[in-house]
Amino acid sequence: MELIFLGTSAGVPTRTRNVTAILLNLQHPTQSGLWLFDCGEGTQHQLLHTTFNPGKLDKIFISHLHGDHLFGLPGLLCSRSMSGIIQPLTIYGPQGIREFVETALRISGSWIDYPLEIVEIGAGEILDDGLRKVTAYPLEHPLECYGYRIEEHDKPGALNAQALKAAGVPPGPLFQALKAGKTIMLEDGRQINGADYLAAPVPGKALAIFGDTGPCDAALDLAKGVDVMVHEATLDITMEAKANSRGHSSTRQAATLAREAGVGKLIITHVSSRYDDKGCQHLLRECRSIFPATELANDFTVFNV
């Protein structure tokens, strides 16, 4: 999987940062696709600065209904239709997301020429497509808000082709059945169990993408053991009380959570517009003093998961 940050500013855009939007490139050999997490104003314009085709976008996950995470959605939906894209799209979000989309389309006289499904979610598993699952966790914010945990299913281990050939199993369709863990019968009557020739399963990757939040009970479960955690660091340590009073987190709180959850990497985003480039580097240093494996997301930064 690959993360592409389309917007990394909190609340309002700056000259160098648009408001929140994160693209997830699934990069799976049998199921390509793009998922979008939040869609602040201007997201479709940010997409134009990438090589990604909006037609590949098949799922959008909205964390909450504050404008800096949502106001780009109607425009993106309409432009997708005007471009002749007919591939289905599913939107997941909290209660009210359906009314928002339908009202925006109705009042503006807009229409959508592709299948559009809107799923209003609660806490718990919201999706399992056979390759990965997505679970929503409630966060601490003035509006109903969720973070999303994306977990790939484990992949089958490598097939020991050399041992199978030595056992007299010819390559081809039988190898495919054994790779799936099935038992086959050879012409001489011998049974070969695929599980006996498979290496241990390869653990799937796990990713946690937080919406806006102050410290909360669900955060540790959401982030526990993931390879990459994306979390806001709206304000620095000296402004922690102000951040919490508005349902946000400081650098210290983001980094401390990453350390306690045992994540592989922390990526901080959603930084206040009060910080220029020098100020953003200060935020990064504060996080790294607690959790060294921290990176700062800028607009169009790409990270592998």
Swiss-Prot record:
Where, by residue number, is the active site? Answer: 68
Q: How does it assemble?
A: Homodimer.
Q: What does this protein do?
A: Zinc phosphodiesterase, which has both exoribonuclease and endoribonuclease activities.
Q: Where does Zn(2+) 2 bind?
A: 68-69, 212, 270
Keyword Cell membrane part of the UniProt annotation: no
Q: Which gene encodes it?
A: rbn
The answer, when asked if Glycoprotein is one of the entry's keywords, is no
Protein name (Swiss-Prot/TrEMBL) = Ribonuclease BN
Alphabetically ordered keywords of this record = Endonuclease, Exonuclease, Hydrolase, Metal-binding, Nuclease, tRNA processing, Zinc
The protein's required cofactors:
Zn(2+)
Q: How is the cofactor bound?
A: Binds 2 Zn(2+) ions.
Family to which the UniProt record says this protein belongs: Belongs to the RNase Z family. RNase BN subfamily.
Q: What is its EC number?
A: 3.1.-.-
Please provide, alphabetically and separated by semicolons, the GO molecular function terms listed in this UniProt record: 3'-tRNA processing endoribonuclease activity; exonuclease activity; zinc ion binding
